[in-house]
Structures are given as C-alpha cells and as structure tokens.
C-alpha cells in the first residue's frame, strides 16, 4: 500500500551499475565487452518494479547474454518479461529470450521484473564479468560493509554508521544509498543524511569501492522513519491547507493540457493535492477509464515533466508516469485516483451491494504494482446516492454511501487518503438529505462539496442566475442552492467543518438571447462554448466577456446578448476568506485546464488560504 507520508520511491531514474553477472558467453564476450545497469522503476512499499539494461560495449556482436545478481534474504522476483529469470536461493539469473540475444556493438536491450521485499541487487555479473565492464584481473572486489545502524533521528536527518568492508588491495570509499539511489560518497564509516521529510520512511544501504575502482555488493538495508508526521489518523487537521485540483485524463486530447502544464503555469508549487479523473465503475468494480491516456500514451522529451522521452518498452507511460515525475519534482503533492463522475456514476448502485468486494477491487486497481507509487489516495464521485443525476439510483438505501466509505477505509487502512465528491444541494429534502453523509464522514478524510453548477442553461429560457453563488440573493431561482446552505446542511448532519472543502469552477455557465444585465433575465438558449454550449473556460471568458457585476459572492458578465457567470481572482479571494471564517478544510477546483497559462486562479486560491 502506498501511504500518504512515504517518500517518493523514485525521484529520478536510479542508474545503479552493480558489480557482476554469470555468463554462458564465449571469451570474446568477457568482462569489458558488455555492461548491465539496474533501475528501480517504482516502489509501492511491499514491492517494487525493476529494469536491467544490457549494452554491448565491445567491437563485435554478442550472440547471447546472461545477467546474474544476488538479492538479500526476503527479496525476490515475482514476475519478469523479456528475459528468462531463474534463481537458486537468493542468487538470480536472467538469460535473453530468442529475439533479443543478438546485440550489435553499441546496441542495448532491456528486460523488466516486479519484485517483493526491501532489498537491492548486488554481485552483478554480465557474461561472467563485472557489470560495469571494469573487472581487474587478480584484484578482488571489496566485501559488503556491515548493515548500517541509524541514530540521532530527527524530522529531517539521520546519522548512519557501519562496519568497514575488506579488500585485498584496500577500500577507497563508500557509496551511501537511500532507497536504492546513491546520495553520498564518503571515506569514513559514518554519514549524516540531511534534508529529509518528516514522518517519512526511508531505506539505507552502503557499498564499498576499492583502489581499483571496483564496487562490492551492497550491505543489508536499514529502515528509518523520520520523526514528525500526522500519526496516521484520517484527516488529522487539514485546516485551510488542502488546495486540490482536478486533472482530467481526457484533457490530453482536444484541450492539449498535460501534466507538464502544471509546472509551466506555476500551479504545481501552489497546490497540495491532485485528483486524477476518471476511473470507471463497472460490474461492481473500479476499472480503468482511458488506458491510452492513463498509462500508454508516449511523451516526447519536450512534453515530459522531467525532460526525458518515453521509450517503447518502459513499464509505465502517459498520465500516470507524468504524475510520478511531477511528484519527484514536487514531493509535497499527493495524488488521488477519482472514480465515477457525472457520466460514470451509474455503476455505483450495483457496486455497493457488496461494499467489501467493491473496495477490494478499487484497492487492487489503485495499488497495481505498475503505478502503486503514483497514488496516495482514492476519491469516490457518486452522483448521486439514493437520488438522481444522469441516471437515478432507485435501489440503494440511505446508508449505502456510508457502507461504501466504511468498506473503503477497512480495505485501504488509516494511512490512505479517502475522499468523496458530494452534492451541494442544501434544499429541504434535497440530495444532501438523501444519503447518510454524517455517518460516512467518520471514514473519510474530507468531502469535495461541488458548490458550482447550481444553475445553468439546461433551463434554456432562464432565468439567468450565477452557477456558483456563495449565499442567497433576492430572486434566486431555488432556495438552498448556495454554498452557504450546503455547508450548513452538512454541519447539521454532524460533518466536521474541517472535513468540508469549498469548490471553485474554473469555467462559466451562460445563456444567449439575454437583454437584461442583472441576474433573472430571460434567454433563448445556451451561449456558444468552445467545447460545449452553455459552458466556457475562465481563460476564454476573462477576455471575451469580462465581468460586469457581482452577485452572491460571484461574478457575472453581460456582453451583447450573452450572459455568463463565473468566478474571478477577486471573487475567489472573498470565497477563501469565507471558507477560513467557517473553519473549512480548504478548497478544490474543477479543473486545471480552465485556468490561464500563468495559473491566476490557482494563485488566487493559494494566496487566499494563507
């Protein structure tokens, strides 16, 4: 399970040239004719993904290759691809399959595997020689140092000590590895690692290097947990700290909005959480929503967060991999996988007939070994339990929602973020009254209260009304359809204020055929929009139809015969002030691509909650 305060297991590609591999090759393919390097591609706590890359560094072709290495006790390969992998106890051997054994000079090939346990490979050999191609005849590699001991552990540092390695010619220095990556090279047998994150798990091991520059096997590993953190209880105290944005997987198509845009806009440094939307709910299970956008689409170097192009054979690509890269650069960001939504909520009623089985299916998908390190939580967006959305839920009892959330908490445990997007219908007998949100709040970290889309051009003749009113105003078409009413209703049902997030739409809703500037006018239908009639991104509206007035804490605009309502940086600031006064848990928004290229709405949320 991927926990909230686990360190990002892979901040970058971990190139670990390790000493050694057994070979079935001829003398022409000995020590210096090939190299093998290991990369840990993912880590989900109880296991990891790994990749070996074999390269022909000689001047003649290789006809076959064999890689060997040792794992410490308790670490093993559970599945592999593009190589035949066998073992004798803790010694592992990988041989080429038929199609990838021949390597021309300078060519390389990779194979991958999933593993369990905390250890790293050591004693690597490629075709009988050192994996780094630097075997020295008559000079033995150093032994493994002693397993490090940890002391003086603080929120941000730890002191490591180990017993010396031995070598026939002498030990020159030691590489200190944190989570498999070298973080320091020292000549002594102690090292203090600084700049760590509080309340976070790390794993350390050490390798010795001799005077011939040969690297020996890694020591055993020691687990270290820095002090601090939240103690593992759901929603310990988010206060006004949660600043969450929805990233839509379909945005990579027509909208041409990618994870890298969060970096170039400056938004990544100003948010705390991302909800990736959407996974589907089908046949009583959580399922992938768009496999191509989620984990298959290849990114070029200029499109990628880390500036590295995807390869055809890497285990994970597309949005999942880009989000992994984003977390490596911005480790404060937590990512949740969101399931359901307006279009895909129809599967929830069947799923909650067996909440435990549904929760297990969601856990198995979110914690799939290929991307378990990407996600820190799950978000359930059921529109709506025991009520109508795109379709009507006519089979679930009022307690179905809390039963689902209870099962999710039991399956995922206390250290995993569990949230839900919920209705903001605060009217008497409305959607909030239809489900047991108060009881369910015992099991969730927070609710994303969808305080937008109260009014829109689905009522094609009007009256025109702001789609995200903070409070009521004279002439509002429906009582209880405001942010204030929704929050008051949830609180009355026992939901703690700090488990409620206010929602901001990064878009406007509008009508055409409108002659009246103030709200309440008649219309002839929805105004034209870039992707859908009646809706338009803020980044477009701020220039095409600038705000001409405010009502109920939000803005509206009358331009020509069109009438739009949307939030601006100024109205967002007032809503953030209100959220803090109410003791809410923060804010979220739908969704990133509606903002300007410099992220001015995200900036307004960020500054408003400080």
Curated annotation (Swiss-Prot):
GO biological process: chitin catabolic process; polysaccharide catabolic process
Domain GH18 positions: 241-610
Gene Ontology molecular functions: chitin binding; endochitinase activity; polysaccharide binding
Keywords, sorted A to Z: Carbohydrate metabolism, Chitin degradation, Chitin-binding, Glycosidase, Hydrolase, Polysaccharide degradation, Signal
Domain CBM2: 31-134
Active-site residues, record numbering mapped to chain: 383
Annotated region described as Disordered, given as residue ranges: 125-153, 208-239
Alphabetized InterPro entries for the sequence: CBD2, CBM2/CBM3_carb-bd_dom_sf, CBM2_carb-bd_dom_sf, CBM2_CS, Chitinase_II/V-like_cat, Chitinase_insertion_sf, FN3_dom, FN3_sf
Secretion signal span: 1-30
Top-rank EC class of the record's enzyme: hydrolase
Residues engaged in binding chitin: 313-314, 340-343, 384, 450-453, 590
EC number: 3.2.1.14
Keyword Cytoplasm recorded: no
Polar residues: compositionally biased ranges: 213-224
The organism's place on the tree of life at top rank: Bacteria
Catalytic function, reaction form: Random endo-hydrolysis of N-acetyl-beta-D-glucosaminide (1->4)-beta-linkages in chitin and chitodextrins
Keyword Endoplasmic reticulum: no
Induction description: By chitin.
Domain Fibronectin type-III residues, every copy: 144-229
Pfam family, one: CBM_2
PANTHER family assigned to the protein according to its UniProt record, in alphabetical order: CHITINASE, CHITINASE 12-RELATED
Family the UniProt entry places it in: Belongs to the glycosyl hydrolase 18 family. Chitinase class II subfamily.
Full protein name: Chitinase 63
Organism expressing this protein natively: Streptomyces plicatus
Gene coding for it: chtA
């Amino acid at each position: 399970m991927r926990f909230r305060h686990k360190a990002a297991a892979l901040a970058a590609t971990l190139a670990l040239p390790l000493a050694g591999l057994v070979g079935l090759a001829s003398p022409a393919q000995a020590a210096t004719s090939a190299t093998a390097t290991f990369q840990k591609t993912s880590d989900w706590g109880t296991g990891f993904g790994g990749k070996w890359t074999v390269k022909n560094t000689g001047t003649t072709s290789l006809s076959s290759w064999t890689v060997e290495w040792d794992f410490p006790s308790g670490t093993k390969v559970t599945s592999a691809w593009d190589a035949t992998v066998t073992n004798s106890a803790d010694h592992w051997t990988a041989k080429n399959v038929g199609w990838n054994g021949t390597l021309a000079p300078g060519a390389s090939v990779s194979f991958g595997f999933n593993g369990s346990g905390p250890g790293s490979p050591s004693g690597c050999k490629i075709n009988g020689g050192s994996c780094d191609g630097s075997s020295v005849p008559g000079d033995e590699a150093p032994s493994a140092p002693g397993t490090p001991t940890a002391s003086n552990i603080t929120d941000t540092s730890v002191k490591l000590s180990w017993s010396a390695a031995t070598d026939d010619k002498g030990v020159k220095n030691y590489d200190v590895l944190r989570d498999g990556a070298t973080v320091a090279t020292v000549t002594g047998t102690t090292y203090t690692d600084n700049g760590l994150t509080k309340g976070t798990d790390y794993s350390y091991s050490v390798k010795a290097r001799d005077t011939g520059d040969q690297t020996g096997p890694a020591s055993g590993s020691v687990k270290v947990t820095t002090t601090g953190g939240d103690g593992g209880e759901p929603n310990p105290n988010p206060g006004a700290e949660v600043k969450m944005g929805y990233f839509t997987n379909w945005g990579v198509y027509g909208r041409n909005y990618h994870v890298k845009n969060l970096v170039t806009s400056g938004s990544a440094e100003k948010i705390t959480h991302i909800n990736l939307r959407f996974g589907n709910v089908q046949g009583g299970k959580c399922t992938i929503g768009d496999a191509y956008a989620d984990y298959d689409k290849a990114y070029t170097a200029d499109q990628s967060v880390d500036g590295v192009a995807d390869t055809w054979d890497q285990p994970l690509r597309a949005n999942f991999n880009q989000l992994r890269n984003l977390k490596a650069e911005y480790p404060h960001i937590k990512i949740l996988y969101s399931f359901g939504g307006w279009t895909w909520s129809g599967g929830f009623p069947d799923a909650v007939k067996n909440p435990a089985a549904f929760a297990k299916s969601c856990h198995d998908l979110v914690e799939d070994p290929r991307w378990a390190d990407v996600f820190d939580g799950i978000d359930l967006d059921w529109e709506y339990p025991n009520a109508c959305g795109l379709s009507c839920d006519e089979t679930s009892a009022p307690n179905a929602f809390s039963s689902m959330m209870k099962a999710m908490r039991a399956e995922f445990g206390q250290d995993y973020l569990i949230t839900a997007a919920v209705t903001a219908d605060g009217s008497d007998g409305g959607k909030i009254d239809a489900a047991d949100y108060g009881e369910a709040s015992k099991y969730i970290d927070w609710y994303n209260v969808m305080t937008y889309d109260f009014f829109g051009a689905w009522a094609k003749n009007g009256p025109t009304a702001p789609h995200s009113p903070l409070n009521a105003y004279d002439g509002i078409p429906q009582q209880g359809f405001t942010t204030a009413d929704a929050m008051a209703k949830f609180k009355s049902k026992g939901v703690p204020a700090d488990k409620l997030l206010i929602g901001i739409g990064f878009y406007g809703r509008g009508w055409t055929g409108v002659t009246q500037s103030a709200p309440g006018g008649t219309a002839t239908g929805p105004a034209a929009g870039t992707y859908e009639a009646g809706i338009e991104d803020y980044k477009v509206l701020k220039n095409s139809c600038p705000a001409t007035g405010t009502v109920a804490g939000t803005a509206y605009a009358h331009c020509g015969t069109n009438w739009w309502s949307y939030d601006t940086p100024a109205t967002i600031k007032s809503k953030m002030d209100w959220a803090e006064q109410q003791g809410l848990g923060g804010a979220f928004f739908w969704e990133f691509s509606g903002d300007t290229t410099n992220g001015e709405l995200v900036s307004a949320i960020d500054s408003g909650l400080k």
